[in-house]
Amino acid sequence: MKAQSSQEQEDGLTMLHRILKDDNVDMDSALSDMEGPSVNQNLDKLEIDYRNQFEIAYRENSFENLEELSDETIGKHVTLDTLLKMDNDVIFKDENIFDDEDRSSRKRQRDSVSDTDTLFNEQTDSKKRKDSDMDSCKNAIDSIMTEQILSPISLSPTPSSDGSIQNDKTESLEIAKDLPKEPRKPVDKPARAKLKNKYEMSNIIIHKEDIPAANLRNRRSMVDNNVIKKISPHSSADHNKTVKKEPVVITNEYTVSQVAQMKRRIIDSHKLLLNFNVIKDNYARACVQLKRSVTALKDSEIHRAHLILENEELKKQLQALQQHSTGKEEANSTNIPKQNILKNEADS
């Protein structure tokens, strides 16, 4: 309904604009033309209704409500601009307009109340959130202060690395300190049986101590016993002064040492990359030089082939010259005896 009413109002305004386009139009003649039966038959019902509304509004505004118009508008003819500038109550006296205004004012009041409520709720929610955040921060700080500071375990080595072996050594030394000091009694070695005959080998009893492997085991056990005797509670302080304990896997010292090792490895890898780049550049230069030498060798081979051809041609020319010279010599040798014979005949 609202859309239809708005469309109707727009159509009425367009018609008003057409009628009131010119200031010199006679409104009475226009109204008489609009009331004519020939025009009303061709127009639709909506146009007729709007024309009737326009007539009513024009009559009310032009004759009865002259007091409400200003001095400037009384002298001039009524146009669309003047009608639009006037209040809606003067042109269209409808009760629906007042109802819409009341409804809009009520809606505005309700919206203002709802906005205040929402602002109050948002402020209370923000305060609650801030309080909860402060409580959570305090709890987190307390938990962090109570925790023990440890190094990251991700940097600790695997069980197969050197760090685990060093840890095992330290643990074995600590266990050895707690062992009793009772020395082991030396074992009496039995005397070896002397061989009198080679047939008495079956009667000889071979002791385990005579075997070289068993002797090695006994020696190792004796060395371990001596080490355990040296590590006593009285001499532990001196031993700690002389020998530096290696850092445990979970301490910060171990992580620092690991970081230093990683830095060294990174530097070494960087050096290797630089050396590789230098080698690569030298290899590229060597390849370029090799290519140039190959091209020079090909050119020299071609030049050598040309020289060989020239040499063969020169040899042929030399042979021809030699043949020509030999022919001349033979001819000269034959001509000399003939001349001598002729001279002798002439003398005779």
UniProtKB/Swiss-Prot annotation:
Residues 101-135, 148-167, 319-348 are annotated as: Disordered. Residues 124-135 have a biased composition (Basic and acidic residues). One of its GO terms (cellular component) is cytoplasm. It is found in: Cytoplasm; Nucleus. Residues 332-342 have a biased composition (Polar residues). Keywords: Cytoplasm, Nucleus. The keyword tRNA-binding does not apply. Residues 149-161 have a biased composition (Low complexity). Involved in cation homeostasis and in the regulation of the cation stress signaling cascades. This is Protein ATC1/LIC4. The gene is ATC1.
